[in-house]
Amino acid sequence: MNIIVAVDSKWGIGRNNGLLFNIPEDMNYFRTMTKNKVVCMGYNTLLSLPDAAPLKNRINIVLAPQGVEREDLIVVHSLNELFTALKNYDDDDVFVIGGGMFYKTMLPYVKNVYVTEVYSDGKATVFFENLSENPDYLKTYLSEIKSYKDIKFRFVLYENLSPEVYSFS
């Protein structure tokens, strides 16, 4: 399982239930990495998408409160239900795409974290764990530094050296 996330210079990821930056190359990277794959998200992330519609050309799984049901995506109401649903897919094809609480919950279980590091302060109110300070995560890939307008960024891969296995309760 993987996480894909864009962070600012303070490891911020969002503000007002939205993204901090709109960088076309990062959006293309997200599309390329997740197309024809499984994307898992929390309910607020789904609501933040245009028309709260599932992402096209992907299997969408949403962890949502009890009572929420949708025909156009897979809705689960607990981590047990989520991990049961994920048994149907190859672990390498699963991407956790947010939001903040869902990232925090899923981080121990993922093998790879694909991070777009943006070297700017996005004035975030929601943050991701700073993996560069966590000894359980090894930085294994760094792209060259890129720029869009006045924003500098790069793509980084962190590998979880000891991912946990979910234990059903």
Language-model segments: residues:
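Enzymes that bind and transform nitrogen-containing heteroaromatic metabolites
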Residues: 1-169
